[in-house]
Amino acid sequence: SIFNLCLISAVMTMGANIQWGYAGLINFGIMGYTALGGLAAVLISVDPVQEAWRAGGFDILMGLWLVIVMVLVIRFILKRFEKSKIRTYSIAAIIISGILLIRFSMEPGIEAIEAVDPAKTGFLGGFGLPIIFSWIVGALFAGGLAFIIGKVALGLRADYLAIATLLISEIVIAIIKHEDWLTRGVKNVIGLKRPAPYEVNLQQTDWFINLVEKFNLSKLNLITDLTERQAALNQFVIEGSSIFVKLCYSGLFLIVVIILLILTQKALYSPWGRMMRAIRDNEEAANAMGKNVVKQHLLIFVLGSAIVGIAGAMLVTQDGLFTPGSYRPMRYTFLIWVMVIVCLLYTSDAADE
């Protein structure tokens, strides 16, 4: 279990290291992207709650439609009109009125959904798909949020960018905690689907029992009493099933880590990677050579955040539950940054030698 957590933390560290090591971007919003990955695991793997959809699904869809309309209107204004105070005030008015209208249209549906068996459900559920698909969706969620943040905040100075990303991650956690219709909030979501077999099922499978018996044959041969021998075998099967499941997760997580390591190393020594290092070392010189610094910063910001989103989905996959109250900056942001700094110090020392 500790080894699996180390693998997941390694994936998070790779995401932060891409942003800092490749482009010099400080992102203290790792906790928010991790939570979005966990949210993806819930939305993908949990079966839809049909009664909740009948109670308030239409109101939720109407609210989402209003969000799309608001975004399209703002995009139209940004493209059609030149920058001015009137444009700024118009966009602000659209956002404020849009939020109020969206909340007003969704409120009855939200109350109806949260009233549907709140002890067990009280939310819309998900798509009922295998949870491993959530790793891809988690990357899309985190990358999408990073794109929005990057469009607004990447022009800030490094210290302001760090503060902005930290505050936005806290906003994400607050939304996940309080929107019960989407995530059950602090009531948690348990019993998520697993990509690995269940221990109880393994303990009743003949091939697994035979495998455990072969591994522990020398110990079992020391027991002469048949009843005691069977009891010892049952205990070995119980212990072995837990180890087998953890090894299954370790195999899946190792595959992800190896793939990401290969891709990041190839990217680092590619022409694109050399360009990113040039931008990191001297933005003004890279800009003078015709490189689009803003675009490349946005790209690396999205890629690093997407990798963190994958790690967030992996974490919830292993735990089998989603607990929004457990997301804290000390564990999911600053500890990861300590790992990034230690890795950079180690690699710089190795380069000096």
Which residues does each PLM region occupy?
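Transmembrane alpha-helices and adjacent helix-loop boundaries
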Residues: 1-349
